[in-house]
Regions:
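Helix N-cap motif at beta-to-alpha junctions
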Residues: 308-312, 349-350
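N-terminal "arm"/small-domain region of PLP-dependent enzymes with the aminotransferase-like
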Residues: 1-41, 52, 321-325
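Short hydrophobic/aromatic beta-strand micro-patches
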Residues: 223, 304-306, 344-346
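Conserved core segment of the aminotransferase class I/II
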Residues: 19, 199, 204-269
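Conserved glycine-rich beta-strand-loop-beta hairpin in the small C-terminal domain of fold type I
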Residues: 252, 268-279, 291-306, 315
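PLP-dependent enzyme catalytic core of the Aspartate aminotransferase-like
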Residues: 321, 335-373
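A short, glycine/Asx- and small/polar-enriched loop/turn
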Residues: 74-75, 189, 299, 335-340
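Conserved core of the PLP fold type I
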Residues: 23, 28-170, 175, 182-200, ...
Length: 373
């Protein structure tokens, strides 16, 4: 069975040897004084290094005291929910969107209201209507403005400005999940919403090193105002006390000596080639052209393919009969179906992508609905 990812990196190209060497050095260096209980916010060395990293590369303006390390971005979302949301609070989220985030918010017994997404990103007019209707119960909005999940669209400049005005007027937190920031293929990436200095106290910036290095290394971070960080730290102490200090110190070394940045450049070039190969495959096969529509993304690790003439559930069934696993569009909506699916290209070689397209082509032929024998 071949599983088409929804947008994960290729773990086969992870910088394993540099990381292993850095971990050995970190373990030796920490043996005498650094292997006891530490700060729940994470290793101070990595927090300082990350602050410099995002300030330089992403236009933020933060210090180590405004950084909290987490176990991946999912850990960051859960930590935010438990620290900042009360039972009965409401948080707005993109729709279609990232369902694991919705579940994290509901873990804190908060209510999630869904805001539609179109070609310019979050429908800020709909968000504003929710804010007025809820009269103070709406506390935050969760967005993926750089590469919206799952549709891959980038939030337009006009929508970004409107979002800032809404959050300022209604005193909402912007929970910005900036996943896949490093993977931009067309020009310079947009700066995060959190780079806006006049809104920094209301911005909660979430990012992850897991997709940059390897998904199995659960290492994410939150950047927020110090008052928010204090609440995050208190809850983190109750959840799992602290992270993996040896891993955190090793990653700090890899960022400081430029290994992470070099790996990102190599990966970005490779993933761009894979994206282009997949787009060529989709464009050159008539059955795929007829059934699939796509707006080529300027970054990220997946395509959002809209279906014509077949439901995503039916395509998933046909693909499964041919030993191919796809995730239906319904995984990204609150209820019902969605005639689309994410095709993650980064984790597959060009040969593997061609083979997957062979299977998809077979699934979309007129007689493909018949049971395979």
């Amino acid at each position: 069975m071949i599983a088409v990812s929804d947008g994960v990196p290729d773990a086969r190209i992870a910088p394993v040897d540099p990381l292993a060497r850095a971990q050995r050095r970190a373990l030796r260096a920490l043996t005498r004084t650094g292997l006891g209980y530490g700060d729940a916010a994470g290793d101070p060395v990595l927090r300082d290094v990350l602050a410099g990293f995002v300030n330089h590369a992403r236009g933020l303006s933060c210090s180590a005291e405004e950084v909290v390390l987490t176990r991946g971005s999912q850990g960051a979302l859960s930590l935010f929910a438990l620290a900042m949301l009360e039972p009965g609070d409401v948080i707005a989220a993109e729709h279609p969107g990232y369902a694991p985030a919705w579940r994290a918010f509901r873990l804190a017994r908060a209510e999630v209201v869904h805001v539609p997404v179109d070609a310019e990103g979050l429908r800020t007019d709909e968000l504003e209507a929710h804010a007025r209707r809820l009269k103070g119960r709406l506390k935050a909005v969760y967005v993926t403005p750089h590469h919206q999940y799952p549709t891959t669209v980038a939030m337009s400049a006009e929508r970004r400005m409107h979002l800032r005005r809404i959050c300022e007027s209604h005193r909402l937190y912007i929970v910005e999940d900036d996943y896949d920031y490093e993977y931009h293929f067309e020009g310079a990436p947009l700066l995060p919403l959190s780079a806006t200095k006049d809104l920094s106290s209301r911005c909660v910036y979430i990012a992850s090193l897991s997709k940059l290095i390897a998904p199995a290394l659960r290492l994410g971070y939150i950047i927020a105002d110090r008052s928010v960080v204090a609440r995050l730290r208190s809850v983190r102490e109750l959840l799992d006390r602290q992270g993996d200090v040896v891993l955190e110190r090793a990653v700090a070394e890899l960022i400081e000596d430029g290994e992470v940045q070099r790996h990102a450049r190599r990966a970005r070039q490779l993933y761009r080639e894979r994206r282009d190969h997949l787009l060529e495959q989709l464009a050159s096969r008539p059955p795929l052209c007829a059934a699939l529509a796509c707006d080529p993304p300027g970054g990220g690790l997946a395509l959002w393919l809209r279906l014509r003439g077949v439901t995503s559930e039916e395509l998933v069934r046909r693909a499964h009969a041919r030993d191919l696993t796809l995730t239906p569009g319904s995984a990204h909506v609150a209820d019902g179906s969605l005639p689309a699916f994410r095709f993650g290209f980064a984790a597959h070689t060009t040969e593997e992508l061609s083979a997957i397209c062979d299977t998809l082509e077979a699934c979309l032929k007129p007689d493909a609905g018949a049971k395979r024998r």
